[in-house]
């Protein structure tokens, strides 16, 4: 009995050659619509789908393969006599191979001219139905959704006249992943359209971007996936101009770096980061000077660090960066001369280019944090803060220079691991206390780092001070200005201590924990 294949594809790459090889192997081919036209034009003889179903394609192509003559031919178990008898009684011929890929829903909704009606019309119904029927019956039916599998299938058919069970099972698994991801995209689109903020089912889909050597540590397996609907301002979308493949830790650090610099839009700024904590932030009227400040902030920790700049890297800045061992440099662009300088004898230096004009769109992305057996979902810590809404809670008002420095410090503290303390002036970070289990410990570490640069310095805390001992430590170091959220039941103790020492202190009313 001649074996039959059903071919209906949106992505026609390689399909003509595949079909010709099938014909050479003695197969009959059933086809539909544009696929049939393409195969017929290439001289591949095909059977029209309506010759199999006895019904014409109708309703603008919405109904063409949803028929017992198709799905009976796919689902009939070859080892069940009752199935085979039912097929015979109803003149249903068996189908042994299905090659289907789906309407381009993802590509359609990414179009700038997308309309709701167009999106709906590009939801495939018949394709997923055939794929799922064939995949369910993979004991007997081979199903192909990816042109990359054409060669494997043809090779096995040529060698043995059939594919192996292992191949059919693998391809079936691929189909179910594919249709699940396809439906997840549709669900995400409709969820967005109706404005459902907290759906009872969370369906998200990601595509494999990079198979990694290992994860956070060598004993951990890891891979990097990119959102199926990619965003431009993302490490997953960055253009790599030089260097080795990004590691797991590189990606996490780089992601933290590009989040930090989003808050420094107004002036040229450089952020240096290690282990997801900023170790140096500098801003100035030009990017070279901003680099100088960021480097000066911590010339020790910068070794092996991640650097992100929010302006084009020029030759002068590149010359200063080149002698230092850095893991990654990220910027919106590089001058031709700067790129030549940075890549000279630096084949491993990872240089990334990222479109900073797409930052705003990245801020609305949800954050996902895995826990054992669960997933936490939250919006990003992105809030429009206006310094005019802040409250000076002490007797002394900040000077103009202190106010500028406090605003800079408040932007910087947002990305320091809690309990987080940062000391800055108006253009660079000076000391950092991160990740301590008590706040006064972070205060002491930050002061120790900044001890030679405390004249005119200010201090920011990511959360309230639970006790006045923090204020006593800060005052003893000579720091005169503090910014913090407030909100402690002992706020008045801290205010009284600040007034006692002549400090100025601002409450922002916004906490910035980062775990």
UniProtKB/Swiss-Prot annotation:
Protein name, as recorded: Bifunctional purine biosynthesis protein PurH
GO biological process: 'de novo' IMP biosynthetic process
EC number: 2.1.2.3, 3.5.4.10
Species: Streptococcus pyogenes serotype M3 (strain ATCC BAA-595 / MGAS315)
GO CC annotation: cytosol
Gene: purH
Family note: Belongs to the PurH family.
A Gene Ontology molecular function term of the record: phosphoribosylaminoimidazolecarboxamide formyltransferase activity
Chemical reaction(s) catalysed: (6R)-10-formyltetrahydrofolate + 5-amino-1-(5-phospho-beta-D-ribosyl)imidazole-4-carboxamide = 5-formamido-1-(5-phospho-D-ribosyl)imidazole-4-carboxamide + (6S)-5,6,7,8-tetrahydrofolate; IMP + H2O = 5-formamido-1-(5-phospho-D-ribosyl)imidazole-4-carboxamide
Stored CDD domains: IMPCH
């Amino acid at each position: 009995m001649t074996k039959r294949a059903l071919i209906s594809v949106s992505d026609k790459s390689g399909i003509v050659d595949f079909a010709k090889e099938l014909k050479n192997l003695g197969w009959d081919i059933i086809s539909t619509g544009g696929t049939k036209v393409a195969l017929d034009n290439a001289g591949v003889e095909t059977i029209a789908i309506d010759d199999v179903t006895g019904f014409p394609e109708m309703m603008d192509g919405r109904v063409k393969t949803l028929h017992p003559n198709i799905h009976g031919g796919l689902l009939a178990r070859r080892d069940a006599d009752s199935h085979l008898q039912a097929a015979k009684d109803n003149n249903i011929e068996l189908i042994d191979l299905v090659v289907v890929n789906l309407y381009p829903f993802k590509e359609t909704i990414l179009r700038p001219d997308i309309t709701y009606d167009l999106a709906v019309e590009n939801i495939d119904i018949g394709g997923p139905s055939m794929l799922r029927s064939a995949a369910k019956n993979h004991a007997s039916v081979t199903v192909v959704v990816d042109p990359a599998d054409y060669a494997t299938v043809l090779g096995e058919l040529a060698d043995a006249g059939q594919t192996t069970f292992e191949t059919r099972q693998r391809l079936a698994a691929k189909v179910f992943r594919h249709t699940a991801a396809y439906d997840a995209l549709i669900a995400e689109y409709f969820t967005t359209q109706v404005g459902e903020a907290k759906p009872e089912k969370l369906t998200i889909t990601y595509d494999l971007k990079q198979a990694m050597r290992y994860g956070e540590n060598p004993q951990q397996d890891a891979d990097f996936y990119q959102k199926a609907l990619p965003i431009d301002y993302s490490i997953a979308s960055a253009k790599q101009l030089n260097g080795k493949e990004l590691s797991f830790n590189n990606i996490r650090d780089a992601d933290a770096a590009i989040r930090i610099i989003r808050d420094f839009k107004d002036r040229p700024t450089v952020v240096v980061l290690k282990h997801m904590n900023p170790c140096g932030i500098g801003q100035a009227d030009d990017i070279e000077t901003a680099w100088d400040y960021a480097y000066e902030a911590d010339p020790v920790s910068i070794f092996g660090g991640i650097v992100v700049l929010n302006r084009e890297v020029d030759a002068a800045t590149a010359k200063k960066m080149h002698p230092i061992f850095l893991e990654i440099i990220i910027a919106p662009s590089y001058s031709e001369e700067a790129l030549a300088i940075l890549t000279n004898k630096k084949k491993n230096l990872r240089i990334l280019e990222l479109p900073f004009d797409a930052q705003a769109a990245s801020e609305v992305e949800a954050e996902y944090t895995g826990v054992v057996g669960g997933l936490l979902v939250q919006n990003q810590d992105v809030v429009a803060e206006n310094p005019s809404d802040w409250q000076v809670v002490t007797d002394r008002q900040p000077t103009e220079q202190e106010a500028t420095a406090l605003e800079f410090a408040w932007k910087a503290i947002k990305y320091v691991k809690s309990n987080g303390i940062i000391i800055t002036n108006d253009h660079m970070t000076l000391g950092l206390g991160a990740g301590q289990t008590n706040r006064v410990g972070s205060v002491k570490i930050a002061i120790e780092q900044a001890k030679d640069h405390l004249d005119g310095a200010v201090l920011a805390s990511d959360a309230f001070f639970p006790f006045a001992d923090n204020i006593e430590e800060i005052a003893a170091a000579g720091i005169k200005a503090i910014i913090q959220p407030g909100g402690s039941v002992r706020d008045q103790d801290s205010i009284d201590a600040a007034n006692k020492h002549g400090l100025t202190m601002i409450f922002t009313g916004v906490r910035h924990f980062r775990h």
